[in-house]
C-alpha cells in the first residue's frame, strides 16, 4: 500500500485542552500527538516540550501557550495547551487561541474540581462551541460505579452551563498509559480523535461568512466620491454590492462602486485583504473610523452588553490599583475607543489587577457587535484589560 500523500487541502480545525490543574491536560496533549503520529503520521511531541510553553503576547498581555499540530485521516488540527490556570483565563478571554472545540480533561480519581467548572463557564462566556470530555487516569479506578458517578457529575456540570451534557462524548482513558504505548489505552486516544472528527463540525471559513470591514480611514477623492479603507474581516465584497454603515451613528445604506487594492481596481475584496471601497453618494463627514461596512442585516449596533474581562496585572503594564463600580474607561472595539461605564456583579465591590470578572458595560455610542467580539479596555491609550462580549443586552 502506497503511503498517503500529505494534503494541504484537509480542513483545518482549532482545538485545545481545558480543565483543572494536574488532571493531565499536558500529558493528554503529548499522548494525542504521539499516538496519532504512530498511526497516521506526523510529529510526536514530548511532555516536556509542551510543558515549557513559550511566552507570547496577545493584545499586550503575556500568555504562556503551547501549540502542537496533529493529523487524523480527514483533518488537520492545531491544538493549544496552557501550563497555568491564569494562562487559560487570558487565552480564552483575549481569543489568542480561538477554539472550534475543546477537550475537557477530568481526572476520574478526583471528579470535577473548581477549575473544571470555571473553564466550562469561561467556555460558555467566550463562545467555545463544542466540548468533548476525556476522563483521565481511569487506569487508577477499578470501580465501574465510581466512573459512572464521575461521568454523571460532568454531564450535569456541562448542562448547567448550557452545553448538551447528555449528548457530550465522554472517553474513558489514561493519557500516561497511552503515552507509554499500552495498546488498550492507545485505542482510547484514537477514539478521542474520532470524536474530534465527528462531533466538532468543520468551522465556517471567514471567507464564507457575511461581509464585514472595520473602517480604519475615510478619504474624499475629488470627482469620485468617498473611499473607506480597512482590512476585510470576513466575507467578500464585490463592485455593485449594497452595504450598511453600522455603528456610532444611525445605520445607513450605500452601494460599493469600486474596490481597490494598492491603487489598482479589483472585482472583489476578500477576507484578510486590505482594501479601499468607493461608496456611492456618501459624504466624507457621514462616516468615521470605528464604524463598519457590512452586508445588510448581518450585524447590528449595540451599547449594553455582558462581558467576561481579564484585568491586567501591574507586571503586565496594567493598573497598580483596583477599580470600583462606576469606573469609566475606554472600550477599544476593532479600530476605535468608545467610553463606557461598568456594573459589577452583586456583592463585588472592587476589581483587582490580575482578576477575571463578569461585568455589564454601557457604552456612550453604539458599536456594531455580536456575541464573541473581543475588545480591550484602555485608559489614555494604555491597555488595562481585555474582554469578550458574552451577551448583548440592548
From Swiss-Prot:
Region (G1) location: 19-26
Cellular component GO terms held in the UniProt record: cytoplasm
PANTHER family the record matches: ELONGATION FACTOR TU, MITOCHONDRIAL (PTHR43721:SF22), ELONGATION FACTOR TU-RELATED (PTHR43721)
Protein name: Elongation factor Tu
Primary gene name: tufA
Domain of life: Bacteria
Family of the protein in this entry: Belongs to the TRAFAC class translation factor GTPase superfamily. Classic translation factor GTPase family. EF-Tu/EF-1A subfamily.
GO MF terms held by the record: GTP binding; GTPase activity; guanosine tetraphosphate binding; translation elongation factor activity
